[in-house]
Amino acid sequence: MKIVLSKIHWTLITAIYMLGILWSSLQPEVHQKHDVVRETVHNGLHVPAYMMLTFLLVRTFQSYKNTKLRIALWAFIISASWGWINEIVQSYVPGRTCSLSDEVLNIIGTGLSLILIKKIKWLTGGKGK
């Protein structure tokens, strides 16, 4: 089933999602006992969060009839930049830090999303690899 949304819909959905990521970055860390499992899950969520952001950015740029290369480049640049902006913002939140490893996970999620989109042929318009 193909979802057909207008430019404004994709833009709004993407902006709201980006604000959700920012909101989650602004939440102070509650002082809890060091728990490796909780931290691993929390850090692992960076990958799917940025995979979804990249997917939304791709769909937004597709709605504006951009070229495939331009779509992929801008989606990567914006997603990776948003991750870095969020890491910097986090450094000002009590109990939170700016983490290079989190940004690496954000970039991994971004890259995986672009690879999956290409493999699933959303980005290529059904023409394959």
Model-based region annotation:
Residues 33-39, 83-107:
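Interfacial helix-loop-helix junctions of multi-pass membrane proteins
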Residues 6-10, 31, 64-74, 96-100:
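Membrane-helix interface segments
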Residues 119-129:
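Membrane-interface capping segments at transmembrane-helix boundaries
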Residues 27-28, 62, 94, 121:
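Short helix-capping/hinge motifs at transmembrane helix termini and TM-loop junctions
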Residues 1-59, 75:
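"…centered on the first transmembrane helix and the immediately adjacent amphipathic helix/loop
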